[in-house]
Swiss-Prot record:
Cofactor binding note: Binds 1 lipoyl cofactor covalently.
GO terms classed as biological process: glycine decarboxylation via glycine cleavage system
Lipoyl-binding domain ranges (all copies): 19-101
Residue positions where N6-lipoyllysine is found in the record: 60
Gene Ontology cellular component list: cytosol; glycine cleavage complex
Subunit and partners: The glycine cleavage system is composed of four proteins: P, T, L and H.
Name the record gives this protein: Glycine cleavage system H protein
Record-linked HAMAP family: GcvH
Keywords annotated in UniProt: Lipoyl
Gene: gcvH
Length: 122
């Protein structure tokens, strides 16, 4: 069964075995407003925790996406790049950004659980 974690940067990461799906939270999507552009890295790219791995631009602001963990991109959500406004419709579901292979599962212990994230956003 997948386990979901959250970051201080308003990203979620759903982990099952050594694979994780990454996206931005509903709270972040609401704060951004209507998303008009998304830039994602290609499959096969590797990154370390904290690296910039994408950009989400809205009518209000641009926001960098930072890697919540170290890994390799298995899949980028190409459909979301084509229709960025979909991110506002289902940010914590079908509008995920990446599927990745985890390099260091130990990094997950540094992330927030649902209760911790709820406390963060008040």
């Amino acid at each position: 069964m997948p386990t979901t974690y959250y970051t201080d940067d308003h990203e979620w990461i759903e982990v099952e075995d050594d694979t994780a799906t990454i996206g931005i939270t509903k709270h972040a999507a609401e704060q951004l407003g209507e998303v008009v552009f998304i830039e994602l890295q290609p499959e096969g790219e590797t990154f370390v925790k904290g690296d910039e791995i994408g950009v989400v631009e809205s009518v209000k602001a641009a926001s960098d996406i930072f890697a919540p963990v170290t890994g390799e991109i298995l899949e980028a959500n190409a459909a979301l790049v084509e229709t960025p406004a979909e991110l506002n419709e289902d940010p914590e579901g079908n509008s995920w950004l990446y599927k990745i292979k985890l390099s260091d599962p130990g990094e997950l212990s540094e992330l927030l659980d649902a209760e911790g994230y709820a406390a963060l956003i008040g």
